[in-house]
């Protein structure tokens, strides 16, 4: 048995090949049935001829509906009029399952398609999306492994919240309330004392009521923490990581990008260094293009969209006002009202994909910020301990993998970047 | 700046080196302070001499407690009496943080150590455990990527349970109840029609009240589904995968295994093929060694421990009685009271690490089993659809990554195999 991509090559022309898959298109005309078969590697046109099969066989194969499954044996030929330039002339076949009508056709509503996501995933678009996504996950991990990072794992059911309590999902843990984690960061920080450079790729959960095109209630979060490096060095790592992923996707999924309408060359042009712009300068840029933003305003989805439409490369926004960022980000010694942070905004209107910063490593500074934030010190005992015993300077970041995938593939909605999106209105299938 | 492993080499003997890390041991004697420093790569003994430093410097470095953090510059020498054969003679140093007393010392109770897991992880044993774990995760994924599998992602908040409802954690989803997923299997099955060969590595959640040494309420679950293959071929893939992981761990973590007291050569001997024993024969074996088991009894932790003490390789147990296994496993045509399944039991008393099977792909057969099991058909509409539209034969498995790690490292308790174990009695830190 060959994959369709393997079979569709010069080497097999004139030979008998066996392939299997699903009916992608079918039509009959003048005693010949043309069936386009798809598998995970591609499509190929096959022909069944009335005068070469028994009447029962010809009837069986001619009556297959879209997405019927079958295997077949036939002769591979060159055929310039077929969609791929190859064609298989069928001698024998076995039907695994005959469908009459496949539920997904053109012109169906969004809700119907979401209810039938398990079938919709078979489209060529989704197949390409899933392949690109797989490359993105693999290459993220490879980038860090190859630089001596270790992959680690942090808990999901937690009692301490990294980013505050309003967007936490509550779980009934044998009768006690507990929360689903929103970030691995604090736990990753505990592991730099053993391993120095760590990353994790895991789901995070946010009970956000947002219905924007870039929010999910569960999403894949890739996070890293690194001992001994500062905010600038962290940005150096990240821009190289993003470009490494882009290059791998172009190399391994060129045709998938094309099929999705994403120009691989536009991506290839997004080479580091990425611009690094202070928050205060981004506010100026925003006002120059007619937005009404003042210093101290946060950048939401809308603002980021308008701003990043101006950029053709990802852009780091640094030095946010302290009030807009969490307690663990250190103040900039040159301007204590700002913190040593960086958000990475994807260009072309996509907006935030990474949030990162240097982390406060001084015990007194951390305790002051915890008190200012009004947090319960006892819940953070283990996080505070890290600054009491052998604390070292360090930085880290969190990357929204689904957002990265959405931007790399230039998709319209984050729901298209993940097989089974979970939003405030959607938990099935 | 060099890592301790890089600095501790012939090439640097006689040269000035810079290293940094944490105090692992310290003692003073006759005007010399011996400090063993550790970083993520290893340890090295350093000496500070009273007559080569200022009195303030000598006092500062001599008074550092365990786990204090520092960087230092000094001359690398060979020193047969040091723990690694190398020694650095300190010229200059910078203390990042001085500790007086590190909370973790010898002879501390289990609960204290679990409460201070964030500090306990710095031990050399845990550092090695975390490194081996990282290799296991990387090599699992590499094995499948290299065979053309795609990594995919499935949802966590679900309304359909794979293995029944009694051990589900309930989440408050904006006021509605929803459950944490226990297995990606059904969702993986939906993706074989696009990609044919898929895997995922993700947390699974089980509200089991067991307090055995091999259960966690959240654990890392690696699952795969593969179109067109049967139960036997699935076992072939799995035994090769297990052996690939073992080989990578031996190659990349030989010293870690030694430090943990696991003999790498005992692991290396566990070459495929692994024995494949029918459930009915395992019951006979159990009774021969004095256990009181009858056909139809399930194998729990205790039974698997006793049975696998007899094996020095992993063993597949196939052909379970239908009643002991879930509805989606097909009956063996040669014996319809048994199913085409396989559990992989790790030897040396460890027991089940994989559960897998062929999956029912015939629509009528599936519907009959769903009805026999008394399940709500409407909740499974999307799973049933897979047998209505282009169904194909397929098989899959789920592997408990923490259990695999526990067995590979020969650990006593699964809690030692994961940084932050979650059990019925433990949700912090
Ligand atoms: Mg933002
Ligand atoms: Mg069992």
From Swiss-Prot, chains A, B:
<dbReference type="GO" id="GO:0006421">
    <property type="term" value="P:asparaginyl-tRNA aminoacylation"/>
</dbReference>
<keyword id="KW-0030">Aminoacyl-tRNA synthetase</keyword>
<dbReference type="GO" id="GO:0005524">
    <property type="term" value="F:ATP binding"/>
</dbReference>
<dbReference type="InterPro" id="IPR004365">
    <property type="entry name" value="NA-bd_OB_tRNA"/>
</dbReference>
<keyword id="KW-0067">ATP-binding</keyword>
<dbReference type="GO" id="GO:0003676">
    <property type="term" value="F:nucleic acid binding"/>
</dbReference>
<dbReference type="InterPro" id="IPR012340">
    <property type="entry name" value="NA-bd_OB-fold"/>
</dbReference>
<keyword id="KW-0963">Cytoplasm</keyword>
<dbReference type="InterPro" id="IPR004522">
    <property type="entry name" value="Asn-tRNA-ligase"/>
</dbReference>
<dbReference type="InterPro" id="IPR002312">
    <property type="entry name" value="Asp/Asn-tRNA-synth_IIb"/>
</dbReference>
<protein>
    <recommendedName>
        <fullName>Asparagine--tRNA ligase</fullName>
        <ecNumber>6.1.1.22</ecNumber>
    </recommendedName>
</protein>
<dbReference type="GO" id="GO:0004816">
    <property type="term" value="F:asparagine-tRNA ligase activity"/>
</dbReference>
<dbReference type="InterPro" id="IPR004364">
    <property type="entry name" value="Aa-tRNA-synt_II"/>
</dbReference>
<dbReference type="Pfam" id="PF01336">
    <property type="entry name" value="tRNA_anti-codon"/>
</dbReference>
<keyword id="KW-0436">Ligase</keyword>
<keyword id="KW-0648">Protein biosynthesis</keyword>
<dbReference type="InterPro" id="IPR006195">
    <property type="entry name" value="aa-tRNA-synth_II"/>
</dbReference>
<dbReference type="InterPro" id="IPR045864">
    <property type="entry name" value="aa-tRNA-synth_II/BPL/LPL"/>
</dbReference>
<keyword id="KW-0547">Nucleotide-binding</keyword>
<dbReference type="Pfam" id="PF00152">
    <property type="entry name" value="tRNA-synt_2"/>
</dbReference>
<dbReference type="GO" id="GO:0005737">
    <property type="term" value="C:cytoplasm"/>
</dbReference>
<comment type="similarity">
    <text>Belongs to the class-II aminoacyl-tRNA synthetase family.</text>
</comment>
């Amino acid at each position: 048995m060959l994959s369709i991509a393997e079979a569709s090559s010069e080497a097999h022309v004139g030979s008998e090949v066996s392939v299997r898959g699903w009916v992608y298109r079918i039509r009959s005309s003048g005693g010949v049935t043309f069936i386009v078969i798809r598998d995970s590697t591609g499509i190929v046109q096959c022909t069944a001829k009335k005068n070469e099969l028994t009447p029962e066989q010809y009837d069986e194969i001619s009556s297959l509906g879209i997405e019927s499954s079958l295997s077949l044996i036939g002769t591979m030929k060159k055929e310039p009029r077929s969609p791929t330039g190859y064609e298989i002339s069928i001698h024998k076949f076995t039907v695994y399952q005959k469908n009459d009508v496949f539920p997904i056709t053109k012109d169906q509503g969004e809700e119907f398609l979401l209810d039938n996501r398990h079938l919709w995933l078979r489209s060529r678009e989704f197949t390409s999306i899933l392949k690109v996504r797989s490359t993105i996950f693999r290459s993220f991990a490879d980038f860090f492994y190859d630089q001596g990072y270790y992959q680690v794992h942090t808990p999901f059911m937690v009692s301490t919240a990294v980013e505050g309590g309003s967007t936490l999902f509550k779980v009934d843990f044998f009768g006690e309330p507990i929360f689903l984690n929103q970030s691995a960061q604090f736990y990753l920080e505990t592991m730099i004392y053993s391993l120095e450079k760590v990353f994790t790729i895991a789901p995070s959960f946010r009970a956000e009521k947002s219905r924007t095109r870039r929010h999910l209630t569960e999403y894949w979060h890739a996070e890293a923490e690194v001992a001994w490096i500062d905010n600038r060095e962290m940005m150096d790592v990240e821009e190289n990581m993003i470009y490494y992923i882009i290059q791998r996707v172009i190399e391994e999924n060129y045709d998938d990008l094309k099929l999705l309408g994403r120009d691989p060359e536009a991506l290839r042009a997004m080479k580091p260094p990425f611009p690094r712009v202070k928050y205060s300068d981004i506010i100026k840029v925003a006002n120059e293009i007619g937005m009404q933003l003042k210093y101290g305003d946060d950048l939401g989805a809308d603002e980021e969209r308008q701003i990043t439409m101006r950029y053709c490369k990802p852009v780091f926004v640094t030095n946010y006002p302290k009030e807009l960022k969490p307690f663990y980000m250190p103040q900039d010694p040159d301007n204590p009202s700002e913190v040593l942070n960086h958000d990475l905004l994807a260009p072309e209107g996509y907006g935030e994909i990474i949030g990162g910063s240097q982390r406060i490593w001084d015990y007194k500074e951390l305790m002051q910020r915890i008190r200012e934030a009004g947090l319960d010190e006892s819940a953070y005992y283990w996080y505070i301990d890290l600054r009491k015993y052998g604390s070292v300077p360090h930085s880290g970041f969190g990357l929204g993998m689904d957002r990265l995938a959405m931007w790399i593939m230039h998709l319209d909605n984050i729901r298209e970047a993940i097989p089974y999106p979970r939003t405030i209105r959607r938990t099935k299938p």
